[in-house]
């Protein structure tokens, strides 16, 4: 799984600036989708071939006893417990503060690898910056400027060396013995553990790896109708006798790790509750990660016709950016609707991994343009020439032509819908990238 880097520090030391610098590559990949809710406290970064998750914990007040500061401190402690590396940020311009000492006292007791980072160090001598902070007892401070990027690359490379050294070896992605990797995600009490037991059943379990610590992942390999699957734990599921129970509190970090590791995500909602911001945040991360998706609306059996209509309208209104995914109305407890749900998992995975030949893509593009031309921007009308596939999981379609920066978001969504219809790309995000050139065939040699 992707390692987790937690950014910790008192307010206004530059955590958000460092977070934005570490995760900027992700922001550029996904266009703003209508209704998409993002939680800016969580993001993904990458150095070379090494991806990682970043958690910005907010201002940390370790001794806060109540109110919003107490809740923020609780969330910070949970993030620290689940992080592979903690980056403790202090302010080099203002020097050591009493609150820094309180945070350092707490962090030393956690047993986590701690990187002490002195921010806002631009234009200052290292010795002058670092001297004050040695007394925190966290080793050599690392001087950076999050705003200008100075020292950030070296720091994150060091942090990733430590983080990846503690990661277990993962199975080969192409290992045929491993099935489709499924993450079942959702807020607490929506029925995740009930769905797990309905899917797996005692006789279908092939292997179960009990984790050594609460930070390790559970992978459950199982078969259903002759097909292999691997379930990734997202909810702190632990085995009790012959069933799994959710015995841990909801963990954002584990949810994000599981989504990143999955081939297909099942977003489980509670039909008897309104869709929350937390549901939308989880859904937004699924889209940003480009994961295939199926929506399960659980506890459907307990609703009358009026309540069902209301639940469907709520789903359409609040999660409209998930219109590429199929929704299934199920009862995990009564095991109804689960067969159709799993067929959609298979379809979503097939769509995410689909191979799209260049001649067929180009033909679909030309037909779409003939049916509806892109609008002019001033005197310029975009010319869309040909298309090829640039990647899978999710599918990336690269369109070549002239003046493509004039293509509107509305027309881009029109093309996406045409490609989805032509190639049956249901259940997966679809990326479209435009590349303009004077001679659209110049790079086809």
From Swiss-Prot:
Similarity-based family: Belongs to the TRAFAC class TrmE-Era-EngA-EngB-Septin-like GTPase superfamily. EngA (Der) GTPase family.
CDD domains xrefs: EngA1, EngA2
Domain KH-like: from-to ranges: 354-438
SMART domains reported for this sequence: AAA
Limits of the EngA-type G domain: 3-167, 180-353
Official protein name in the record: GTPase Der
Chain sites annotated for binding GTP 1: 9-16, 56-60, 119-122
Binding site for GTP 2: 186-193, 233-237, 298-301
Annotated function: GTPase that plays an essential role in the late steps of ribosome biogenesis.
Classification via InterPro entries: AAA+_ATPase, G_ENGA, GTP-bd, GTPase_Der, KH_dom-like, KH_dom-like_a/b, P-loop_NTPase, Small_GTP-bd
Superkingdom to which the source organism belongs: Bacteria
GO biological process: ribosome biogenesis
GO molecular function, one term: ATP hydrolysis activity
Description of how the protein assembles with itself and partners: Associates with the 50S ribosomal subunit.
């Amino acid at each position: 799984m992707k390692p987790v880097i937690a950014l910790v520090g008192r307010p206004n030391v530059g955590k958000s600036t460092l977070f934005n610098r570490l995760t900027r590559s992700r922001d550029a990949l996904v266009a703003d989708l209508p209704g998409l809710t993002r939680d800016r406290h969580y993001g993904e970064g990458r150095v070379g071939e090494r991806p990682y998750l970043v958690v910005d914990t907010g201002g940390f007040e370790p001794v806060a006893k109540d109110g919003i500061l107490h809740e923020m401190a609780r969330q910070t402690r949970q993030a620290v417990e689940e992080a592979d590396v903690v980056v403790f940020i202090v302010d080099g311009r203002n020097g050591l503060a009493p609150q820094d000492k309180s945070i350092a006292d707490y962090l030393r007791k956690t047993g986590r690898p701690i990187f002490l980072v002195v921010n806002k160090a631009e234009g200052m001598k290292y010795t002058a910056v670092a001297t004050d902070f040695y007394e925190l007892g966290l080793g050599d401070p690392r001087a950076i400027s999050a705003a200008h990027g100075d020292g950030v690359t070296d720091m994150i490379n060091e942090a990733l060396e430590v983080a990846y050294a503690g990661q277990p070896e993962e199975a080969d992605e192409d290992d045929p013995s491993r099935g489709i990797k499924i993450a079942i995600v959702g807020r607490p009490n929506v029925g995740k553990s009930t769905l797990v037991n309905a899917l797996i059943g005692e006789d279908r379990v092939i292997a179960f790896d009990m984790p050594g610590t609460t930070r390790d992942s559970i992978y459950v390999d199982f078969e259903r109708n002759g097909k292999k699957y691997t379930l990734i734990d997202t909810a702190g599921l632990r085995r009790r006798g012959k069933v799994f129970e959710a015995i841990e509190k909801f963990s954002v970090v584990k949810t994000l790790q599981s989504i990143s590791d999955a081939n297909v995500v099942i977003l489980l909602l509670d039909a008897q509750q309104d869709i929350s911001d937390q549901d939308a945040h989880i859904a937004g991360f699924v889209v940003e990660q480009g994961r295939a998706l199926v929506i399960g609306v659980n506890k459907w059996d307990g609703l009358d016709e009026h309540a069902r209509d209301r639940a469907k309208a709520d789903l359409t209104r609040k999660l409209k950016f998930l219109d590429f995914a199929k929704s299934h109305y199920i009862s995990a407890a009564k095991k109804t609707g689960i067969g159709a749900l799993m067929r959609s998992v298979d379809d979503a995975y097939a769509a995410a991994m689909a191979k799209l030949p260049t001649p067929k893509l180009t033909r679909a593009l030309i037909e779409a343009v003939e049916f509806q031309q892109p609008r002019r921007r001033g005197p310029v009308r975009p010319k869309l020439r040909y298309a090829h596939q640039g990647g899978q999981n999710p599918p990336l379609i690269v369109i070549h032509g002239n003046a493509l920066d004039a293509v509107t978001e509305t027309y881009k969504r029109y093309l996406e819908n045409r490609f989805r219809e032509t190639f049956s790309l249901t259940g997966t995000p679809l990326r479209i990238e435009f590349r303009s050139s004077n001679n659209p065939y110049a790079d086809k040699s």
